[in-house]
Design a protein with these regions (language model features):
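Short glycine-/aliphatic-rich beta-strand segments at the starts of folded cytosolic domains
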Residues: 1-13
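Short Gly/Ser/Thr- and Asp/Glu-enriched loop/turn motifs at secondary-structure junctions
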Residues: 3, 39-43, 76
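Short acidic amphipathic segments
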Residues: 14, 23-40
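Short amphipathic alpha-helices in soluble, non-transmembrane regions
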Residues: 21-26, 59-68
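Conserved short beta-strand edge segments in small beta-sheet-based binding/regulatory domains
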Residues: 35-36, 66-76
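A generic structural motif
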Residues: 44-49
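Helix N-cap motif at beta-to-alpha junctions
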Residues: 50-55
């Protein structure tokens, strides 16, 4: 198992409800171990830990882009 951390930047003005939906849908992807927003310092930053042997990063980013087409990913 190869675990990778990834940071996805989303629009800072997304509502709390939309951020919760993104978090849940990303977390529900096969191969994702955890996905959480940094609610205090960077509420637009979704931190994802996933198994890159199971799910490609683009698939995870595509989930976030359903809610914010301009979402971008940064490897950690």
């Amino acid at each position: 198992m190869t675990t990778v951390d990834m940071l996805i930047h989303l629009h800072p003005e997304l509502s709390t409800e939309i951020r919760a939906k993104v978090e849940k849908e990303v977390r529900d992807c096969n191969g994702v171990i955890t996905a959480n927003f940094d609610h205090h310092q960077h509420p637009h930053a979704l931190i994802v830990l996933y198994n890159s042997d199971v799910v490609p990063s683009k698939q995870i980013l595509d989930v976030a882009r359903r809610y914010d087409p301009a979402a971008s990913m940064v490897g950690l």
